């Protein structure tokens, strides 16, 4: 039987085609699946990692972006420890729909859930949403922020490891560990996080559009599923 100290449930949400599936597979399998199709309903993968000397099991749930699956995916919000809200930096409509996703999160998720805004596909050279706009949106809504590229593996491991570190800090804090706040502050001072709005966003340059009612997938050279 596998030994681990913590089990955390992380749920990815966002429009179809923003790259949710590719982020999950890049982190859990080290793969970028070209031509990845849309997620049907909900899928999940597990990865055990070591963070701050603790063995952590991450249960990562990949949800469909299509409207017809919404009632299914909403049921997974409430038990989530962290919610990653993903948009495509090269597709304005995926950013414009963020308020709709946030309303869902506020309605169905635990009020204390850790929320992270992720601008994916930074390998793309046709950026439509500047990094600063993403950062400002995250700060306005008390979310952490990071830009990633599942295709180039840019900031993908960092995203999940920092989430795990934050969740460990919360768990220790609940257990009365006085060092939790200090550890979190140290991570921030070392560039792990910038206040409550950012995981220290570091832009590079990644595609695929998809309205809130479209699909959950994305692609190869020019797109990342999700």
Segments the model singles out, each with a brief description of its role:
Residues 45, 70-75:
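Conserved alpha-helical scaffold flanking the Walker A/P-loop in AAA+ ATPase domains
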Residues 79-99, 109-113, 122-128:
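Conserved Switch II/interswitch segment of TRAFAC-class P-loop GTPases
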Residues 78-79, 140:
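Alpha-helix C-terminal capping/helix-to-coil transition sites in glycosyltransferase folds
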Residues 1-17, 21, 55, 111-117, ...:
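Conserved P-loop small GTPase signature centered on TRAFAC-class small GTPases
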Residues 60, 84-88, 117-120, 148:
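Conserved beta-strand segments of the P-loop GTPase G domain that flank and frequently precede/overlap
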Residues 56-69:
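Switch II (G3) loop of P-loop NTPases
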Residues 29-55:
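Switch I (effector-binding) loop of TRAFAC-class P-loop GTPase G-domains
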